[in-house]
Swiss-Prot record:
Residues 1-25, 114-193, 208-233, 695-715 are annotated as: Disordered. Pfam families: DUF4686. Residues 21-98, 165-580 form a coiled coil. The keyword Coiled coil applies. The gene is CCDC30. Residues 1-22, 133-193 have a biased composition (Basic and acidic residues). The keyword Coiled coil applies. Residues 208-223 have a biased composition (Low complexity). This is Coiled-coil domain-containing protein 30. It comes from Macaca fascicularis (Crab-eating macaque). Belongs to the prefoldin subunit beta family. Keywords: Coiled coil.
Amino acid sequence: MSQEKNEMFESEWSKEREREKQLASGLDTAEKALKAESEELQKSKSELICLYNEVHNLPGASESRDHFLIACDLLRRENSELETKVLKLSQEFAQLNHFTLRGKTAPSNLITSENICKDPESNEPVLEIEIQSPKEEREELCPKLGERKQKEIPEESVKEGSFPREGQKEEGSQQNQDMKDEEKEQRLTMKPEEVVRLREELSRINQSLLQSQSSGDSSDDSGAQYPSSGDKLKYNQQGEVQQLHQNLHRLQILCNSAENELRYERGKNLDLKQHNSLLQEENIKIKIELKHAQQKLLESTKMCSSLTAECKQSQQKIKELELEVLKQTQSIKSQNNLQEKLAQEKSKVADAEEKILDLQRKLEHAHKVCLTDTCISEKQQLEEKIKEATENEAKVKQQYQEEQQKRKLLYQNTDELHRQVRTLQDKENLLEMTCSQQQSRIQQQEALLKQLENEKRKYDEDVKSNQELSEKLSKLQQEKEALREEYLRLLKLLNVHVRNYNEKHQQHKIKLQKVKYRLTNEVELRDKRINEFEDEIGILQHKIEKKAIQDQITAQNDTLLLEKRKLQEQVIEQEQLIHSNKWTISSIQSRVLYMDKENKQLQEISLRLPATKKQKEIYSTEVCTCNNAELQHEDESVPKATEKWKHSEQMETTISDILESEVVNEILPLSNSSFSGKGLVESFVSLQETDDIKSKEAMASSKSPEKSPENLVCSQNSEAGYINVTSLKETHGIQEQDQKSEL
């Protein structure tokens, strides 16, 4: 039920908001129309003043002045009526603004009503307050609507003394507004009393709950030895008590929100008072302006009286002229001319009268549209005045007919009359132009009146919508009464539940104490276990950290050991290379020395014991082959093998030269013998340098184990060469022994 009511509230408030928006748009249009009307009224006032000045400046046109004065009076009355309508519209606009401000505060009340519907048991008084507030607004709006309807009824009579009456009406409306403001203040002062009453009720409920709890505690102490088995009922009752506390808290919050709303409304009322004071100041200014306008009208009436005096003076002058006409009865021709001119003037006067009648008809038609009853009386007055004017015209015509005989001597004044007639014609043309302008303005005012009628229709529609809202408010009041009944029923149920709770609370208190003891013991045991587990966790974490550090250290040691092994292998390989290189160098040096010695011996033998050419050639070929074989075995891995081959070829050429010429053998210098030895030493040194370079490259690239077999091969080749040299030495030794035996 509460949800359905909430939905109903929301739908109604949404509709009211849409209507308020429509009213706001209508108010804006009304404001614009009022501004336009005020501007047009000011323009019409200025134009009327100009017309008055023109009429006063017209000399010798008394009849036309009377007609125009009548028309000006009518226009003044119309302006006064329009001003009254403008004031009414402004008052209605202010009232509608006040209504829209109240409508804006309505959504905040809606939010509070939604919260209240959720808790119908605890928030019943707040609903009553909120339902009373739209009632009060309705009561305030009803007299306002009646006043508006009364203001819409057209006034039956508008006379010359309308200005002071309008001022009295404005003062009466201001007094009514002041009375309404005072009533609102009194209502606002009453609302805090309701808030105080709600607070007292809340305090009473709190006290009753505290007393029930205290009585429950005392009964628990007395009946501690009789435990019962209604645990479920106990928990349910505790939940109900908690809900009651929550409801009380919500009531306190709602009271605070109501106080804030009251403060907000008071501030609003102060703002409205300021606004009313400003409006009063504006009304005072408008009154002052009206007084100035009245003073100007009085001045214009004085000017009219002065013009009437001038007309009388002109009539006296005309009489004097008539006397002169009686004396001058000589010119008959001038009489005829004057008669013709008078006939023309009469025709012009008739035309002017017809135009005036047309203007009067148009004005009467405009007055019929604006004012129904007042125009009839004014028309009668105008008809009487017109009759009087026609009678005066007839009398004047009779006087003119009587005085035709007397105007025979006015021939001298004809030129002056011609001039006056021309000036009058010009002024008549100007007056016709002004009349046409006034007609156009009257049409504009008629259009404005139509707009105002449309706005009145809209206002009637708003009144109907307000009636519908009043019906809805009556429905809400009925719902409020139903909620009140539900509230009383719930209060009775609450009292029953509280009694049951007090009875059962005594039984459950003992069980709660036992459960508390058990829980405290279990909690202490759990705390001890938790502390033990925390200590064990700290120890395990410390061990885990140590293991992680040890694993890191072992991993780093493994990597370092692998690097160390690699470096040791590289160092061993380098040492082996150095050792092999040293051994090869020492073996080569020994061989070189041995070869030098053999060469010296061979030179000595070749000098001492000349043999046959064939033996020498065989011996030289054997030596060359041996040397070539040694050089090939030693220099396979060396890039400078070509140089050694060149040295061997040079040796062959030298040996062949020695065998060919015996003379040269005796004079052979020692440089040739030393040449081969030194060249071999240099070649061995170059080989040693190349080996050092290769050993360094092996250290850098760490790939020396692949080169160790080559070194072994070189060493084997060098050993083979050494064996061959020894065998050659043995052969040389055998040959020397044979030669000695032959000698």
